[in-house]
């Protein structure tokens, strides 16, 4: 295994470019099939643009603790505390179409907006389900790919 610190400071574009450069160097090395682990990378758009064997992240639980839910690659504030804050990530500040999409996903996943506003544990569950939905859509880059969390 090679561990990669892709969660650098900077934009998603910077992290994607760094990850791709790492992949290029590995591909041109004497061991191009080595397994790779991306430390602390939970941003789906970054992971969609690099090829690693595994990754770990705490973004799902951090978002929940800070009053946010994950919807695709967006963090949306829903907690009671954050509702009062004038923030462009607050659900109430989103377009009507996005609000409707988020409310639909909340219902589909078996939650209510009210419980997500009040309960960080429920937000964490919601965020895990968002990640699992994304994982289910992944296509393996190699035959050793394992689509699952191991439990």
Residue ranges and their predicted role:
Residues 9-25, 71:
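Active-site-adjacent beta->alpha loops and helix N-cap segments on the catalytic face
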Residues 1-15, 35-39:
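Catalytic beta/alpha-barrel core
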Residues 24-34, 43-151:
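Alpha/beta catalytic cores of nucleotide-metabolism and tRNA/nucleoside-modifying enzymes
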